[in-house]
Amino acid sequence: MQVRGMIIDVTEVNFRREVSEAELPVLLEFYAAWCGKCAMMSDVLAEFAEKNAGRVKVCRADIDRSPGLAGKFGVEKVPAFISFRGGEAQRAAVGVVPYQALDEICGRHE
């Protein structure tokens, strides 16, 4: 497992521990190294992780390294963001989204 700042890299091996069994709500980004839009979201995701430390666990999964996870959640386009509570997928967004949209899919601005 690699951690970039406050963002945890998730794979099929550690998904259960990092996402399904997480005590905090989780925001999981599905991305690909070759994806330009994913690169555009990296600063937004890093800011979200920093500002929500201790309230939301931020993770990311590379669809090329963990295709089973992408398939399990029906991810066909990247970047894709899915929020989890109690290990269950809740809300999702796809594409380049503003910071506020990440708050909204995590249920932080209802």
Where are these regions (language model features)?
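CheY-like receiver
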Residues: 18, 69-72, 105
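Short pre-active-site segment immediately N-terminal to redox-active cysteine/selenocysteine motifs
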Residues: 23, 31-34, 77
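Short, thiol/selenol-centered motifs that function as redox-active sites or metal-ligating centers
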Residues: 34-41
